[in-house]
Amino acid sequence: MSKHTVLFELGCEELPPKSLKTLRDALQAETVKGLKDAGLAFASIEAYAAPRRLALKIVDVDGAQADTQKRFDGPAVQAAYDAEGKPTKALEGFMRGQGITADQVSTFQAGKVEKVCYLKDVKGQTLDALLPQILQTALDNLPIAKRMRSAASRTEFVRPVKWVVLLKDDQIIEATIQDHQAGNVTYGHRFHAPEAVTLAHANDYLAALEKAYVVANFEKRQATIQEQVKKLADEVNATAIVPADLLDEVTSLVEWPVALRANFEERFLAVPQEALITTMQDNQKYFCLINSEGKLQPYFITVSNIESKDPTQIIEGNEKVVRPRLSDAEFFFLQDQKQPLASRKEKLANMVFQAQLGTLWDKSTRIAKLAVALSPITGANPADAEKAALLAKCDLTSELVGEFPELQGIAGTYYARIEGENTEVSEALGEQYLPKFAGDVLPKTKTGTTIALADRLDTLVGIFGIGQAPTGSKDPFALRRSAIGILRLIIENELDVTIEELVNLALQGYGDIVKDHDKTLADAVAFLEGRYRAKYEDQGVAVDVLQAVQALAPKSPLDFDKRVNAVNHFRALPEAAALAAANKRVANILAKEAAPEGSVVEANLVEDAEKALFAELQAVTPAVEPLLAAKDYTAALSKLAALRAPIDAFFDGVMVMADDADLKANRLRLLAQLRHLFTVVADVSVLQG
């Protein structure tokens, strides 16, 4: 069968930059699906995307479908022929319906019945016939939220379509896609090479466009931007901040990237750098530069879509554009300083946190009381914790946060520093929202840890207290994410406290607002404990490890974490699988018949294997007990791993359910002692082999 290289390009007006990569990937995925559904094999497929085009190159694709046979079933052979072997009316009707003669009739076995059939040869359709509809269907299935229709077209797309290229090697495939006749003509850069570019072969696409100042390959264009940006940053001994989403967006905005470094006035560096970075990244799509200490430098890098003969004009134009935005940030910052943070509480008293739970000032006072109560646990200074809590939400009323909501907390830190607050208090204002996402950093200060914990606990307990716990996909207060934050704050700061203690402390701040304290306590504790699984699955911990620990229901997150780590370590030991299986066996035996009260009677140990196991238990128990007391669970389980050989020997050579009642009772007690030792850390019988 012949193989071909196919090129498809859809040219249009500038595509939405934030969607370009998604559209490219979806076009490739949908086309692959269409080719597979049609039975057209291919070696590889590459997708391209630039501001004015989406394209595909399909390598070594079949020139046609394989020929097939289609079976049309008729009556049973018994009903198709009479006693003399002549066709019955049933068979004649079948042949007439299929337009065939008797010599074209075949038979096949359908279970226990033999039937007649007609095997019709079906010639496979050509690539030329199939591909246009495959591509049109792929375009129709793209994830486009809002489609538009141009005046001259009956079809809809995310942007008006201008041209279509569809080549099979050096031949145009006759097709109409998106109401445009396919051809072999594409177009280069809108300004550098606006004239038509005729493609002689599908393989010429990338090279022909690069000659016309278009880099169609998204990844190549992106790599070029990264190289240029790094070079410009290196020239001023700085490092560029290159967020992945911003890099994708900038790559989607240009066909021929040319990075240029510009300056802004150094006086703006007095403004919180987070505000400057935010406005330059979000509004201007610039890459900001920082020094080795992470301090913003008075430069930015813009990526132009043209190679100018006078780049100075572009640089000066961007400097002129960014100045008003930086001036706005400076104005907000200076205006905010005219009003001390503490004086903003009156505005907080008019900002609703949640209708039933009061205002943001109500929340602040609850957090302050809770922070003081948490201070002995976190090691924070109670006075610092209380002050930080009362100031924590004040920057929400500031001009700077009003313009840049993502600066909440950060703005407060700057203002607190200016007002002379100590480091614990000022840093806590910015740290209160940490961690913001999975894997994010935690607060560095004890006061920040305290406020972050108090804020989350107050919200969680309050929302549960008014009966608005998360249900299904509804979690308007992001309590699931917040719960994992609480667990991380406790575990990673090694806070020795139970979830129940923390929830109880938070409940005290609500008084009569929460009507059923007992139910709220139980529900909130269960919710937090239920988030262990999400937390540890993110870390790659196996489900059976969690189940082994959860079987003991540890109350302290820190203790829970130590047990998980210990079981994870134990699970990797060569003895683990055999010990888990043995413990399952022990658990099953004791479930059927509980061990009698009392200790093992050494005189009733008659078999060598049971004597050896008892001796090992007597030796290992005093070695393990101090480790358990110190919560060194990893070392404890490692010690217990040495019991594998005597346990295996016991089950190989000893009948637990002996006819002699005393021997049986003694062996059950021995197993109970063993079971107890292995379930102090976790129920290892839950572990899978």
From Swiss-Prot:
Q: Name one GO molecular function term.
A: glycine-tRNA ligase activity
One Pfam family name from the record? DALR_1
* Its EC number(s): 6.1.1.14
Task: Quickly give the catalysed reaction.
Answer: tRNA(Gly) + glycine + ATP = glycyl-tRNA(Gly) + AMP + diphosphate
Q: Which GO terms describe its biological process?
A: arginyl-tRNA aminoacylation; glycyl-tRNA aminoacylation
Q: Which family does it belong to?
A: Belongs to the class-II aminoacyl-tRNA synthetase family.
Designated name of the protein: Glycine--tRNA ligase beta subunit
Q: Which organism is it from?
A: Acinetobacter baylyi (strain ATCC 33305 / BD413 / ADP1)
